[in-house]
Amino acid sequence: VKGVTNLNDAKEIIENDFSSVCNGGYLVVPARVLNAACYGVPQGRERVIFYGFKKSELTDEAKKQLSAKVISSEYDPYPIPTHYLSKKFCNENEIHYVNVKQAFYGLEEPKQSLDISQQKFSKAKFMGKHCQGQQEVKLEGIGPTIRSEHHGNIEFRRLSKEHGGIYIKELEEGNEERRLTVRECARIQTFPDDYEFIIPKKDGNSSVSASEAYKIIGNAVPPLLAFNIARRLQDNWTMYFGG
């Protein structure tokens, strides 16, 4: 998590520990904080990413480039951003961030949905906006960080007028105050809709509850961020390791 960069020398200690694996057989490039929103994830989720390369597998040029104080853009293993947080600074061919409204496109309300992950949501009551998880999501903005430890206090899809909700039209249409569903959290994390999070107990097999599903989603690296990391390595593979 990003907080590791705020601890005294923690990042450097971790980098040195990784480098010492297999008697110093790994080349570890300086860690970097990546914001998932810069890669098409509709969520402000920042994570520290470490890369370690087995020295014996790298080409001589790759070892030289990856050991440089400043790694060239060509050899840089970190993925190039695909989306930008400020529309003001986007070039013509660059894309603004994906917002929550776009992420929720096509989702029905829980009572109308046939998807069990869209039917289920935390019933924890509103506790006042001074507490964590008591805000409603901003549909035109980036989603909140989906947390694994939340004790039911998942952010709200919408609040009532009484609690300061701003989606008045939705409320007037009869939609209730409620927290984010499991599927909505999964959409914010960029999981595909065919990923089943809630599994009923059947034929003696173990089950997964809505509470457990929230935790699984919150613990995950957003799949779209992971994809961009992997694709960058794939694109540079021959350059790093030869033909």
What is each model feature region?
Residues 1-140:
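Class I S-adenosyl-L-methionine
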Residues 107-243:
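C-terminal target-recognition/interaction regions appended to catalytic cores
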